[in-house]
Amino acid sequence: MRYEDLTRKVGPLEFTRITRDVFRSRSALRDTLARNNPGRPLTLPPIDFNRREVFLVAAGPRSSTGYDLRIVSLRDEGDRIVVTVHERTPSLGDPVRARVTYPFRLIAFPRSDKPVKLKWPGRP
């Protein structure tokens, strides 16, 4: 399935724990972002929730700039949508800076109202 990555459009956000959720309304998305980022100004791009839904996956805090999340695939499996994510972790010697980062991905895709399942190899 095709999707749009909205991560850069919402700016830097900080999710202090592993988070995964699907949003079918602007208010639900805004509430979750505000609850996880108190006091931080939020910027939401235009999203037509009549036609699209949004999925959030966040890794929680990481110790350097070498971590990142990547959407590997988004598949409609008939009775559900499956989002597969890969977390990039730094190797010894990678040019990274030691500081707390909060990798996340926020994607929009055609609305289906099917359950959305996260497949994140190596994570519960």
Where do the protein language model's features map onto the residues?
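Exposed, flexible binding/inhibitory loops of compact, secreted disulfide-stabilized domains
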Residues: 1-124
